[in-house]
Amino acid sequence: MNIGDTAKLNTNPEDSPETILRLFVYGTLKRGYWNHQRFCAQARSIEPAVVWGRLYHLNAGFPAMEVPEGLILARGTADPLADARRQQEIGTPRFGRPTGDWDLIHGELVTFTDPQRDLPPIDRLEGFRPGGHSMYQRVMVAAGCRNASIAVWIYRMARVTNGERIDREWRG
């Protein structure tokens, strides 16, 4: 996949750029899975996207992903609006294959217009606590979507120790 074009995805004149937050989901938050309706019903849009990483099916029955440390653009905070602004500041990151044993992971790009309402419940679901011990960390990476590169937030595990590595896409 050649991702090099700059593109504005899902823009709406009523949305302030500072309030748009894009989240890449690869598991139970995807359409058709048990957490989607509860946590993503308020999304402005949802579309296919890809990121680089290693995907695992955990023994607990849900997925986790590792992402290359060198691809992390920012780390999540307890301030959803600051995180949305940071995403806008990053702009169009480079999306390229990292060195090492990484896969192109397929998931969905979920665009929210009210990060203060939408992000804290997902952070709680994922066990993300900025500055504390977290099950998942929310980090920003580059994603490929519609032949464009875009900065997205993603929940990742620093190291997966209790799951089976799977290829490309989690299907439950």
Residue ranges, per PLM feature:
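Glycine-aromatic micro-motifs
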Residues: 2-172
